[in-house]
Regions:
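Short, hydrophobic-rich beta-strand element in sensory/regulatory alpha-beta domains
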Residues: 69, 112-117, 214-217
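Extracellular/periplasmic ligand-binding regions of membrane signal-transduction receptors
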Residues: 63-97, 120-132
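Juxtamembrane extracytoplasmic/periplasmic/luminal helical "stalk" adjacent to the first N-terminal
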Residues: 8-85
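Extracytoplasmic/periplasmic ligand-binding sensor regions of membrane-associated signaling proteins
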Residues: 106-113, 120-196, 257
């Protein structure tokens, strides 16, 4: 009679062990799920705060550029020179005065690399009379010029690009452009640009840390990349980014999973520029650090 009793005891012990193991496994899964959800939610909230700060700083730079453009646009000498309301013998005098005026404005900020006005009267002035322009005739073919014409009276912010209007200079910049127009009639008399050194944006974003592998990048509303830590690789088709998904997501987040692992993309769109700032966090890294 002892043998059946032992079998029953063994069966009960195995069943109890299985129950304990199963319960522990279920609890571990539940704990992991809740931990992961909590970590992901905290990560989204933290990333949103960082993005908001980055956007506020960028918007501040853009505001300054717009203020510069407005001061130039409303300057009486600029208005008179580009609307041809001064006698021919005074034009050289006005050229010098306006260049000095632009020089004084550009000198207040080291992040401004170029201020240029291209008038419909054929005149082109910059903050430095010594700058040699590549081809005045090619200026109307520049995208920043054309967009300013399309948005007459409104400011237009470009994505990052190489500015090549100055001979021998190929600077990465963010360009603000707008038309020079008569405040009374609204008639356009030319286009002005203010170039902000791209390094300002790059330094602002690159110093933000999202773990060991995470990163931030910025995309313009047309899908062009304003800043990305792997920008050159993307342009060379050596790496891809989920730009289409980002453009579909004005604000909020989405998750992608590929050969690089599972990642959370947190997106926020600036009402000021229309740019989307994106924070990318690696889920595995978040849970591991937890």
């Amino acid at each position: 009679m002892k043998q059946p009793s032992r079998k029953i005891q063994t069966t009960i012990a195995l069943a109890f062990a299985a129950l304990v193991f199963g319960t522990a496994l279920v609890m571990a899964i539940i704990s992991y799920t809740f931990t992961r959800e909590a970590v992901e939610e905290n990560s989204r909230a933290y990333t949103e705060q960082l993005i908001d700060q980055v956007q506020a700083n960028i918007d501040s730079y853009v505001d300054h550029m717009e203020n510069v453009a407005e001061v130039v646009q409303l300057n009486d000498q600029v208005q008179r020179f580009f609307t041809n309301t001064i006698p021919p013998e005074d034009r050289e005098l006005y050229r010098g005065r306006i260049s000095a005026f632009l020089t004084s404005i550009a000198g207040t900020r080291s992040d401004i690399s170029l201020i240029l006005i291209a008038g419909d009267n054929g005149e082109v002035l910059t903050q430095d009379p010594g700058l040699e322009l590549r081809s005045v005739a090619e200026i109307p073919n520049q995208r920043w010029y054309q967009r300013a014409r399309e948005e007459s009276g409104n400011t237009v912010i470009s994505s990052s690009h190489v500015q090549n209007v100055v001979e021998g200079e190929y600077r990465w910049v963010i360009t603000l452009s707008r038309t020079i127009n008569d405040p009374l009639t609204g008639i356009d008399h030319g286009v002005m640009l203010v170039d902000l050194n791209f390094s300002v944006i790059s330094q602002l974003v690159s110093r933000i840390s999202l773990g060991d592998k995470g990163y931030l990048f910025i995309v313009a509303s047309d899908g062009s990349i304003v800043y990305h830590p792997r920008q050159e690789l993307i342009y060379s088709d050596l790496e891809r980014e989920y730009i289409d998904r980002v453009l579909e997501q004005r604000d909020g987040s989405f998750v992608v999973s590929d050969e690089k692992g599972e990642r959370i993309y947190t997106v926020s769109t600036s009402n000021r520029t229309g740019w989307r700032t994106v924070g990318v966090n690696y889920v595995g890294e978040l849970v591991k650090n937890r």
